[in-house]
Amino acid sequence: MSCGEPHETDCSEILDHLYEFLDKEMPDSDCVKFEHHFEECSPCLEKYGLEQAVKKLVKRCCGQDDVPGDLRAKVMGRLDLIRSGQSVPEHDVAAAPSSSAPQES
């Protein structure tokens, strides 16, 4: 996504690192670049607002559950694959079969 306007920091870079900004996982100097970008780019600001709302909703609904570290690492790895344009292996996308599901013979 791009608004088509030139910016000091490109829209694609902002969107690629949006969750790092939302989660406060980036240096202050980078945060300043993001804030400046949002001041001049309404499409990115809108996307930021939407993702911020989703994050708050998830926290409110699921905030009491601890996420295992290995699950977080796996999800972040998959997000990195997606952001880099690589495809996620099909076996990682499909739901694992339930133990109560009937077995085919």
Swiss-Prot record:
Summarizing the annotation, the consequence of altering F38A is: No inhibition of SigR, no diamide induction of SigR
Region annotation Disordered: where it falls in the sequence: 86-105
According to the record, mutating C44A results in: No inhibition of SigR, no diamide induction of SigR
Effect of changing C62S: reported as: Reduced sporulation, normal induction of trxCp1, no binding of SigR
* PTM description: Under oxidizing conditions up to 3 disulfide bonds are formed. A single disulfide bond inhibits binding to SigR. Cys-11 forms a disulfide bond with either Cys-44 (the major bind) or Cys-41 (a minor bond).
Region Contributes to redox-sensitivity, residue ranges: 33-47
Note the effect listed for E39A: Wild-type inhibition of SigR, more induction by diamide
Kindly indicate whether the keyword Disulfide bond belongs to this entry. Answer: yes
Q: Which domain of life is it from?
A: Bacteria
Question: How the cofactor binds, per note?
Answer: Binds 1 Zn(2+) per subunit. Zinc is not required for SigR-binding, but is required for anti-sigma factor activity. Zinc-binding renders RsrA relatively resistant to oxidation.
* Effect recorded for C11S: No sporulation, constitutive expression of trxCp1, no binding of SigR
How does inactivating the gene affect the organism? Viable, but defective in sporulation, white color. Strong induction of disulfide reductase (trxB) and thioredoxin-2 (trxC) that is not further induced by diamide. Acts as a SigR constitutive mutant. A double sigR-rsrA mutant sporulates normally but is more sensitive to diamide.
Q: Which InterPro entries does the entry mention?
A: Anit_sigma_mycothiol_RsrA (IPR024020), Znf_put (IPR027383)
Q: Which residues bind Zn(2+)?
A: C11, H37, C41, C44
Q: Name one GO molecular function term.
A: sigma factor antagonist activity
Q: What else is known?
A: A quadruple Cys-3-Ser, Cys-31-Ser, Cys-61-Ala, Cys-62-Ala mutant has anti-sigma factor activity and is induced by diamide.
Kindly provide the name given to this protein in its UniProt entry: Anti-sigma factor RsrA
Q: What is the lineage of its organism?
A: Bacteria, Bacillati, Actinomycetota, Actinomycetes, Kitasatosporales
Q: Which gene encodes it?
A: rsrA
